[in-house]
Amino acid sequence: MKGFTKHSILMACSIGLAINATAADWDNIPIPAELDAGQSWELQQNYSDSFNYSGKNSTFTGKWKDSYFHSWTGPGLTHWSSDESWVGDGNLIISASRRQGTNKVNAGVITSKTKVKYPIFLEASIKVSNLELSSNFWLLSENDQREIDVLEVYGGARQDWYAKNMSTNFHVFFRNNDNSIKNDYNDQTHFTPTWGNYWRDGFHRFGVYWKSPTDVTFYIDGQKTTKGAWSQVVMKDKDYTGAILDKSRYNMDQEAFIIIDTEDHSWRSEAGHIATDADLADSDKNKMYVDWIRVYKPTGGSTTPPTGDITPPSGYTNLQLAHSNRCVDVINGALWNGSTYQQYSCNTGNNNQRFKFTKIANNQYSINAKVSQLCMELASGSSANGAKVQQWICNHANSNQTWSLEDKGSNTFEIRNKQSGKCLEVANSSNANGGQIRQWACTGATNQRFKFL
């Protein structure tokens, strides 16, 4: 266990062995998120902590508050208390106990003293508690309107499914004047442990690369998750109106505090899923451990900002997706009206993937497939998300066959339909061959970004 390793190092120091006092626990653990060409990671000292000290000394108080960032004492039966967090044995410890004389729960919480903002990578090594309470690692904007949950799990839930399934979550809140919730657009994505039976069985790494307001991706035990990224979620106001969020207007665009805590959520306690007095008093169950947290920003590199209109090649070219590195492909090399497109492994010698851009007006083009000599068309000129994109006999007077290229930087661009104003994308951010090419509201996500190949 990590605490044992740190204790051993201290013993080694006492007998005179030389060690690097500035080494961090994560130094030999690669950062799993990918950088753009020429970039490097820069450690953010104000938020990174190995917890290689005891008590809440100046290192702790220089980075963290042992309370929430404002006066709220927590959801449901939660009562956040500074007495329920401390540093010892090389870990931050977040505990819980019964609040004397009440049915409430004293719970630990720490909050970063200042806010973070994209682009930024955060990762923590955490062993969750064995309680009905949730163990959490999350980000929340100061106005309580934007939330990114890197970890939420009921580690000791008596319902097995909840103990085995942690979630990553997004929330976009709209609030009333008294800060009560008017709308809560959210989506959750669940994951079982990469090893062991329960998340409480040991330390796991939970990370997020908040690259931009529309590019947020999670990492578990050093692996990028295949689901749950901002580009993949459907944000629904489940508890209020049932409406779907327009992600082309609202996204993860606000700076946020880092929060590590435990909570008794009202929806669970109201359903009878309550931490018992015995469990809350059990020192083997009532603690969440954080071995370390590291935070980095990407710096430097040759990444170029948007500069204006994109100029296509004069001849035929492939269209490569930024998120999957696969190419737009006419399915089965079809030659008829109404046939459709997919993404497929790139092959510049495959005519199914070769397209020519014919200029119609300033930054307006038709897109002609070499294999069929048919043009890319938005079926029926639909404005709906998910609308079919098909091949059809070319007619440059049709606005549903007219596309503009919007520069997104780093030699990538969006392809927008003139009639609908919406973007081409790969459905559900699929990385697989056969991923559907369709129309969707423009979000800036990488499954809507293309480059010439």
UniProtKB/Swiss-Prot annotation:
Similarity annotation: Belongs to the glycosyl hydrolase 16 family.
Entry coiled-coil feature ranges: none
Enzyme Commission number, as recorded: 3.2.1.81
Name of the gene encoding the protein in the UniProt record: agaB34
Biological source species: Agarivorans albus
Signal peptide range in chain numbering: 1-23
Active site per UniProt: 147, 152
One GO CC term on file: extracellular region
Protein name: Beta-agarase AgaB34
Annotated compartments: Secreted
Classification via InterPro entries: Beta_agarase, ConA-like_dom_sf, GH16, Ricin_B-like_lectins, Ricin_B_lectin
